[in-house]
Regions:
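Primarily the internal scaffold of c-type cytochrome electron-transfer domains
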Residues: 9-236
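Parallel beta-helix/beta-solenoid
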Residues: 1-9
Length: 236
């Protein structure tokens, strides 16, 4: 499972059904590349190399042509919590139903307040239990995340995406008595606070004991303690 999420593709050398799987070291696409979300691209490249004037993308997956669940499945592959594969690694491709390749742990996607649910790797389960997701018929991971841009830490950008639904003057807008300028810069620290992961720790230079990694909770909610800290920081 580590490889399936941290590389785009690896050719399996072991026989079907044999665990642990072994891989061809010369058949690995390192990192998360285009094919992770757009599917195998050899035919796409071959066609457009020969047909340079054809601007309509052929033989490639475009997320705009997929259903909501198909779009979500691409992310659930690596952000869906404790999903167990039922078919060999790297056989799922975008556009297919993830449930045909994995047993999805739906139980962990319900009791999100349970402290045993880790923020690392279970972003879909947490998001799926949030009111924002439940009350929308179109919300996907791409509603908030642009997979083609590096946006980590840019809270103002994410906050603007929150406010595309939570608009000033509506009942679902922030009730804090702060200026619109202050509110529009950081919805994230209040409603998606960073939480310690119980699954992932990092070793820092000069420290003997690893520290828990902090990951933003994707259970979008009201966190009174985080709101209090936010107001205190603004008033400093």
């Amino acid at each position: 499972r580590c490889l399936e999420c941290h590389v785009t593709y690896a050719g399996i050398s072991s026989a079907p059904g044999v665990e642990p799987e072994e891989y061809h070291h010369d058949q690995i696409i390192f990192g998360v590349d285009c094919e992770k979300c757009h599917g195998p691209a050899a035919d796409h490249v071959a066609f457009h190399t020969e047909n340079t004037r054809d601007t309509m993308a052929k033989y490639i997956i475009n997320s705009s042509s997929l259903s909501r669940q198909q779009n979500l499945d691409m992310c659930v592959l690596c952000h869906g919590g404790n999903i167990q594969k039922t078919k060999p690694s790297f056989t799922y491709t975008p556009g297919r139903s993830l449930a045909d390749y994995f047993k999805i742990d739906t139980l962990s996607m319900v009791a999100v307040q349970n402290e045993n649910i880790d923020v690392h790797g279970n972003q879909y389960g947490l998001l799926r239990s949030s009111k924002c997701f439940k009350q929308s018929t179109t919300m996907t991971c791409n509603t908030c995340h642009n997979p083609h841009e590096k946006e980590r830490g840019k809270t103002a950008i994410f906050s603007q995406r929150c406010m595309s639904c939570h608009t000033p003057g509506h009942d679902n807008f922030c009730k804090l008595k702060l200026s619109l300028t202050q509110l529009s810069k950081n919805c994230i620290d209040c409603h998606m606070p960073a939480r310690k992961s119980m699954a992932v720790a990092v070793s820092l230079p000069g420290e003997e004991v690893p520290r828990a990694a902090f990951v933003r909770s994707h259970f979008i909610s009201i966190y009174p303690d985080e709101t209090k800290k936010m107001i205190e920081n603004i008033n400093k």
